[in-house]
């Protein structure tokens, strides 16, 4: 199983039935799988905080949700996480393509890449950083369950080395 297949299968096997996403080159194959899957409702959004809001509404309507995004959008989401998700105890599995840390060629990605883990810690979102597809499959399922139990988001950070398993 390659990197994208592991993420997709773990989402399915976690019982997630509603996904929002923001476009990302690393996540594009996963997003294509989700678009083709009739058992999962996939709603592309234009901004990450919009995804937080849509996932919140879906959760309140009885759905099990996930948000797929690039780490550059984490900063955009902080207010929605603090004022909506934390206050109303909304579990969301957040799968983040972590740019700006390893092998990054776009200098504008580097600051957020360096701050991502600290931001997650500041807003008290637990996170896991799997290195292989098998590890990602297990940790995504664990993170989804933890999110439900905590009634709060849990994140998966997928760095550049992880995505090399798609090649």
Curated annotation (Swiss-Prot):
Keyword match Ion transport: no
Gene Ontology BP terms: coenzyme M biosynthetic process
Assembly and interaction partners: Heterododecamer composed of 6 subunits alpha and 6 subunits beta.
Keywords: Coenzyme M biosynthesis, Decarboxylase, Lyase
Gene3D superfamilies registered for this protein in UniProt: 3.40.50.970
Coiled coil feature spans: none
Cross-referenced InterPro entries: Sulfopyruvate_deCO2ase_alpha, THDP-binding, Thiamin_PyroP_enz_TPP-bd_dom, TPP_dependent_decarboxylase
Catalytic activity, EC: 4.1.1.79
MF annotations from Gene Ontology: sulfopyruvate decarboxylase activity; thiamine pyrophosphate binding
Originating gene: comD
Pathway(s) where this gene product acts: Cofactor biosynthesis; coenzyme M biosynthesis; sulfoacetaldehyde from phosphoenolpyruvate and sulfite: step 4/4
Assigned protein family: Belongs to the ComD family.
Official protein name in the record: Sulfopyruvate decarboxylase subunit alpha
NCBIfam families reported for this sequence: sulfopyru_alph (TIGR03845)
SUPFAM superfamilies on file: Thiamin diphosphate-binding fold (THDP-binding)
Role of this protein: Involved in the biosynthesis of the coenzyme M (2-mercaptoethanesulfonic acid). Catalyzes the decarboxylation of sulfopyruvate to sulfoacetaldehyde.
Catalytic activity: 3-sulfopyruvate + H(+) = sulfoacetaldehyde + CO2
């Amino acid at each position: 199983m390659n990197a994208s297949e592991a993420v997709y299968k773990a989402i399915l096997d976690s019982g997630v039935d509603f996904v929002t996403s923001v476009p990302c080159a690393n996540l594009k194959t996963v997003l294509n799988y989700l678009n083709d899957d009739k058992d999962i409702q996939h709603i592309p959004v234009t901004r990450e905080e919009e995804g937080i809001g849509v996932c919140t509404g879906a959760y309140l309507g009885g759905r099990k949700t996930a948000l797929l995004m690039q780490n550059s959008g984490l900063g955009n989401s902080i207010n929605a996480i603090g004022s909506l998700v934390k206050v109303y105890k909304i579990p969301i599995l957040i799968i983040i393509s972590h740019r700006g840390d390893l092998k990054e060629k776009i200098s504008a990605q580097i600051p957020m890449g360096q701050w991502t883990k600290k931001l997650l810690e500041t807003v008290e979102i637990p996170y896991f950083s799997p290195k292989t597809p098998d590890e990602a499959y297990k940790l995504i399922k664990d993170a989804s369950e933890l999110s439900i139990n905590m009634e709060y988001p849990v994140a998966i950070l997928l760095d550049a080395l992880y995505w090399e398993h798609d090649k």
